[in-house]
A protein has these predicted regions:
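Conserved ABC ATPase signature
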Residues: 142-146, 150, 446-450, 454
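Conserved ABC ATPase "signature" region
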Residues: 120-137, 422-441, 552
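ABC ATPase NBD coupling module
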Residues: 69-86, 104, 112, 233-237, ...
Length: 556
């Protein structure tokens, strides 16, 4: 089924989101739509199926097959959505219903559009689960029991269960590790081709786009500025915004021939601030901030028992920049949550600055009154993986960013609350500017008014505002386009250069980012450390087959 958009313009109040956009996707064609965060990609995709805010003004035309979407009523749109058009949304954890089982979720479009008996529905669900690489053992699970990769596969299965003729995929691999990204894209494109369907694939990642589409459009500030075959855009970009995206993608990709940044791009991220090479740790072996010994973590009940960590040893020294890498479900997030006292450990012990903050024996009793624990929580900041889940939807950006300072306000040196407020406002302005957000523009906004990349920038700003001794970032750039990543990497590296004693832990599946941020790396697989060492040595000469698999999947 074809998609034909002509002269589409969309505005909300005085803000113009899309301006005179025209594009087409032919029958059986896979087309990409690429652009930086906030360029209007997701809004264009939503406009293609009538999922736009009620207060928006939209002009132009959008045809799905012979059906006109612009101006169509709700009943007409309901007949098209889910049956003829399937949508894979950006964040599966937000798109899926948390109170529905996987089976109920995938079966819902069938129940809405077809009159089938229950056995037929369940058989189709099982067949679709098998096609997306999932087993029948997850049929009765809820979304919160699934990994990110599993949730995204369930989202794809839900979108494809009715065999629609047009697939709209909005950043379907965001926040997935490189191996899972490759598998999901290959699986999605294979299913689309087998069904003879068309697909519009929205992304900011050229390494993903090269696998998902044959040609693409480039969107910049709500306008289409370029279009060509994907290979042509990668090899010879002509438009400025396309060049920036391609250069940024190459700068942050892995190269088997040359892992140094300076020879790969001319962007602002320079080798003098590339702390993966400059921050060699001169601390003594005993100068550790965190020491974790023989950490075991068991999740779930007796029936669903999962050993998330299996005897992990972990040291973090003063000034060290360390990366934890691994696929979805490898235990990366569980490890950092254990370090920060957010996850009970089943065995082992954790020390912070030489003092025990958690053991298996005291894990179940409150440590809030323990001075060592309180000291650790004051001096450590965490950037969560999902910014929308971490930000209070009722709070403005300014209030969210200032929250850590408000909590520890009594430690700030000032003579009055008025001075305190001025100091806090000044610090909020500083960190928002640091992550590339104008405080005058974004300070009064709410999370629902932010793009995915902008929300992640707010989360990073909030983590930095307290000048932490330890910064722990859990997939800090999973929702940010490649152009923004270079600016954020610059910000991280400038901060590290000015505060050489601050230790950082970067949890990521993005090996291109890790090579510029970390001096050492730990590779986790199924809760076990399979390889560790100097980041350049690991990336250029990996010993373990799993490490090689991660690197191969991340190479552009």
């Amino acid at each position: 089924m074809s998609l034909d958009v002509k002269g589409l313009s969309l505005s909300i109040g005085s803000s113009r989101i899309l301006s005179d956009v025209s594009l087409n996707v032919k029958d059986g064609e896979r087309v990409g739509l690429v652009g930086s965060s906030g360029s209007g990609k997701s809004m264009l995709l939503r406009a293609a199926i009538g999922l736009v805010p009620s207060n928006c003004k939209i002009t132009g035309s959008c045809h799905v097959g012979n059906a006109q979407i612009v101006g169509a009523n709700d009943s007409a749109l309901a007949r098209i959505r889910g049956k003829y058009v399937g949508v894979v949304f950006q964040q599966a954890d937000r798109a899926l219903n948390p109170i529905m089982s996987v089976s109920e979720q995938i079966a819902l479009p069938l129940r809405l559009h077809y009159n089938l008996d229950e056995n037929d529905i369940q058989n189709r669900v099982k067949v679709m689960l098998e096609k997306v690489g999932l087993g029948a053992n997850i049929l009765n699970k809820r979304t919160f029991e699934l990994s990110g990769g599993q949730m995204q596969r369930v989202g794809i299965a839900t979108a494809l269960i009715t065999c629609p003729k047009l697939i709209l995929a909005d950043e379907p691999t965001t926040a997935l590790d490189s191996v899972t990204q490759k598998d999901v894209v290959n699986m999605l494109t294979s299913l689309v081709d087998d069904m003879g369907a068309s697909m519009l694939f929205v992304t900011h990642d050229f390494s993903v786009l090269s696998r998902a589409a044959t040609r693409c459009y480039v969107l910049d500030s709500g306008r289409l500025v370029d279009s060509a075959r994907v290979g042509e855009l990668l090899e010879n970009p002509k438009v400025r915004s396309t060049k920036q995206l391609v250069l940024a993608a190459r700068a942050l990709s892995l190269s088997k021939n040359d892992l140094s940044l300076s020879s790969k791009n001319d962007l602002s991220l320079s080798s003098k601030n590339d702390l993966s090479h400059s921050n060699k740790n001169n601390s003594s072996k005993d100068d550790c901030i965190f020491k974790a010994k023989n950490i075991h973590v068991v999740l779930g009940s007796s029936k669903t028992r999962v050993e998330a960590l299996k005897g992990v040893d972990f040291n973090l020294r003063v000034g060290e920049s360390l990366a934890l890498i691994g696929g979805s479900g490898s235990g990366k997030t569980t490890l950092i949550r254990s370090l920060l006292g957010l996850q009970e450990i089943s065995e082992g012990r954790i020390e912070y600055c030489g003092k025990v903050v958690e053991t298996a024996k005291n894990a179940k009793k409150s440590s809030l009154k323990d001075s060592a624990y309180v000291n650790m929580r004051k001096q450590c900041s965490l950037v969560f993986q999902h910014p929308f889940a971490a930000l209070d939807p009722r709070w403005t950006v300014r209030k969210s960013v200032s929250e850590p300072l408000e909590i520890w306000r009594k430690n700030m040196s000032s003579d009055s609350n008025t001075v305190d407020s001025h100091v806090i406002d000044s610090k909020v302005d500083d960190v928002l500017n640091l992550v590339g957000l104008n405080p005058n523009v974004f300070g009064k906004r709410y999370p629902c008014e932010l793009s995915g990349g902008q929300a992640q920038c707010v989360a990073i700003a909030r983590a930095l505002i307290n000048n932490p001794r330890v910064l722990v970032a859990d997939e800090p750039m999973s929702a940010i386009d490649v152009a923004e990543r270079t600016r954020i990497l610059d910000a991280f590296n400038v901060i590290r250069a000015n505060r050489p004693n601050m230790a950082c832990v970067f949890v990521s599946h993005d090996l291109g980012m890790i090579q510029h941020l970390a001096s050492s790396v730990v590779v986790l697989k199924d809760g076990v450390v399979v390889e560790s060492g100097n980041v350049s040595q690991i990336l250029t000469n990996p010993k373990h087959s799993y490490t090689r698999e991660l690197i191969d999947a991340a190479t552009l």
